[in-house]
Swiss-Prot record:
Pfam families: Citrate_synt. This is Citrate synthase, mitochondrial. It is an enzyme of class 2 (transferase). Keywords: Mitochondrion, Transferase, Transit peptide, Tricarboxylic acid cycle. It comes from Xenopus laevis (African clawed frog). It is found in: Mitochondrion matrix.
Amino acid sequence: MSLISAGRVCARILGAKNSPCALIAARQASSSTNLKDVLSDLIPKEQTRIKNFKQQHGKTVIGQVTVDMVYGGMRGMKGLVYETSVLDPDEGIRFRGYSIPECQKLLPKAPGGEEPLPEGLFWLLVTGEVPNQDQVNWISKEWAKRAALPSHVVTMLDNFPTNLHPMSQLSAAITALNSESNFARAYAEGVNKAKYWELVYEDSMDLIAKLPCVAAKIYRNLYREGSSIGAIDSNLDWSDNFTNMLGYTDQQFTELMRLYLTIHSDHEGGNVSAHTSHLVGSALSDPYLSFSAAMNGLAGPLHGLANQEVLVWLTSLQKDLGGEVSDEKLRDYIWNTLNSGRVVPGYGHAVLRKTDPRYTCQREFALKHLPDDPMFKLVAQLYKIVPNILLEQGKAKNPWPNVDAHSGVLLQYYGMTEMNYYTVLFGVSRALGVLSQLIWSRALGFPLERPKSMSTDGLMQLVGSKSG
């Protein structure tokens, strides 16, 4: 039994939406190390389950839509099926039912390492099953085998102007990789739609494999005078190869990267990057085009650039107030920020109503590896002070820190000071989640997304007719 069925069975039995069955060993079911073979077994069962569910409940009403929802970015509107993760307002993200602490405990790790390997999370997101070490090793070697970039993409990256933002370079390079798309080629030749998922799987595996090379090349070109990224080592895991290509050899930084790439991978389906990938993919655009579009969304200040804005604000705070700051001075500074009409970056979330568990696991990493770092101390001090001020102000629905409040500080500590680049790391990680879902979207035959739009006059008439 996979998570896809086991989690729901457990929830029904125990009457809980997040049951202790998240730790059931039976979800480590498949013995094959070939991910595609495992999927080939899972997909027909899930197709049948959903077909039966739709036949029985296809006309069932699952919620109401208000005028505020329509004008408010569709917040809270139930309108997407997204299998790989669910965001609970109180508990935070669950990857196929597993919390971040559970993933840290259960997913395989590198020899001598303590953080989960992103390869293991990808296996979990795709299959719903916790992989064993052999399955994770298979993914690592498979991605190493697929990692080489075509020459035209290398030439393209080497000729970008240095004032072109790293995210623009990432998006353009991913789009150019579309020349390698198995899906686009087969679709043009009239492939049967039952084969769509297999082609999307191949493209997704290729793209994830190549992303560290693209991202490292951007970094080297912009910040390391165009020095070589070197070669992929098939004996190393995905994160280790990535940090080596970036030019970092500290194994603590590699451990941080494993954690970072794991926790930023997915955040259910309604956020801008995940929804964009789903929307563009629903037009049967190939994974390269779908993911490139997602990266353009991630580049927005309200999505992936937030961690950069946090660090800019922290640096400005340090410059204004000096080294060690008293709690009283910090409170005054925060109130001045709020009273000037600005927000405290890194606090609040559209869905979460508690401290983001992605913040918590980064805090725990810092407490273990860099407890005396001045910037970390400042972040920890803010954690004690900011929520109470936001509650006192009375405007924030969620006064607690999110993932962006911490990640930049950790990267800075290990020497990655180039803030413009941070969202590229976020993008590399996000591929694990949105491409896992893209495989399933094609496997389940999800149609072209086409919601109904209305004008303000039309809404007013509708409301008038309903209230009349």
